[in-house]
Amino acid sequence: MRYDGGRSPARSISVVELIATGTLDAELAGLLWLLVEARLPMIVAAAAPRTGKSTLLEALLAFLPAGTRRQELSGFAEDFVWLPEAAELGWQGGRDADDRLRDRPATAERVTRADPASTYLVAPELSDHLPTYTWGEQARVAVRAASRGYGLGATIHADSLGEVFALLGGPEVGLTAEELSRLGLVLVLRLVPGGGRRLAAGHYVRPVVRDAGGHIQRLGPAVLATWDPVRDALDHFWWGILPELAERTSRRAGDFEAEQARRASYLAGLVAGGLTGWQEVVAAIAGYRASDPAGAR
């Protein structure tokens, strides 16, 4: 399906409402807007149930550009028939995509091949708890797809970046360190006293790259922001890797910084104006892009 601002469930919570309730702030949301718009992979992690992982993921997916194909994974039943690179990415489902497409029942929904330049994979949860969740070989192929340019949004039960790495790098999924470096954004969500939710830490996982001589260059993950429980506020550190983040959006560092500030201010204005409804926020995001096409890529 083409992305039109979200699934619109009965009670969707917008990113502006999450800012208003303190889950994250406008500065981090403005940064994530730029990075999600560039289709960076994004994992939302939380250890406790009902913390709001899916709520945060869906709210941030509203930042995907118009025309993005959102490809929901089908859990244990996922066959990647729509993914041309599936076999190259290690899918052991047997034959190539042409054979699998040809053998689908005539009554099956028409399958359109995915294009990495415009497709964002979505896994409601990375785990083996339910058949609708994504785990094992399916999870491995989905993360590997990020190396081919596909976006990926998912949630996972984990309380830290280290736990995310341990789960996805463990024997059941079996991702290598280089493959884990494609996770992009890892956002850790926690419950706080009183029943609130806070984005406790935001990480940018730097992809392994090779220099001109073919040598592997590994840089550790960078912290974008962390929550200070004393002040009940986020401390921001993303400016320390500003050039790297700007490069992911094909912008110069100065342009990226200015655009992040504009978007953060815009979101703060929506909070101040009480514009928090899902459809209102989706329309406001579209309106921002329409009024400033140079700032929305």
Question: Where are the model-predicted features located?
Answer:
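Generic amphipathic alpha-helical segments used as scaffolds and interaction surfaces in large
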Residues: 19, 152-155, 272
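Short alpha-helical basic/polar micro-motif
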Residues: 30, 58, 181, 209-214
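Conserved P-loop NTPase
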Residues: 185-271
